[in-house]
């Protein structure tokens, strides 16, 4: 079965748990996106995991990072929802 590319925004406790679960099931390749390089460094490298330091406030960069993914999941505070949704629409990915 081909793995679906999925982006997760937010590498805190919730985002990391979602990431680990999706990687463990074997159906997804995960791009974990966070504005904090330090936060991403805390997460061990795993097959199928790509980590990207990126701020969702960078609309163009974030939109470009989402392209080619099946969907994006948010594990960020509620006030980031609009920015993530706009980038998902622009990149034509599910949110």
Question: What is each of the regions a protein language model found here?
Answer:
Residues 36-39:
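Helix N-cap at the beta1-alpha1 junction of Rossmann-like dinucleotide-binding domains, i.e.
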Residues 53-71, 75-76, 80-83:
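Conserved Rossmann-fold cofactor-binding substructure of NAD(P)-dependent oxidoreductases
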Residues 6-10:
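Conserved N-terminal Rossmann-fold NAD(P)-binding element of oxidoreductases
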Residues 85-95:
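Beta-strand-loop-alpha-helix segment that lines the small-molecule cofactor/substrate pocket
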Residues 22-23:
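Aromatic pocket-lining residues of Rossmann-like dinucleotide-binding sites
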Residues 14-15:
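Hydrophobic/small residue at the entry helix of a nucleotide-binding pocket
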Residues 29-31:
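Short beta-strand element of Class I
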Residues 46-47, 66-71, 91:
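Short acidic/histidine-rich motifs immediately flanking catalytic phosphotransfer sites
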């Amino acid at each position: 079965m081909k793995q679906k590319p999925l982006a997760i925004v937010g590498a805190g406790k919730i985002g990391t748990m979602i990431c680990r679960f999706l990687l463990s099931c074997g159906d997804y390749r995960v791009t974990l996106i966070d504005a904090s390089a330090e936060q991403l460094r805390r997460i061990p490298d795993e097959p199928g995991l790509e980590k990207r330091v990126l701020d969702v406030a960078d609309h163009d960069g974030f939109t470009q990072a989402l392209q080619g993914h099946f969907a994006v999941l948010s594990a960020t505070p509620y006030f980031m929802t609009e920015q993530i949704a706009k980038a998902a629409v622009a990149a034509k990915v599910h949110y």
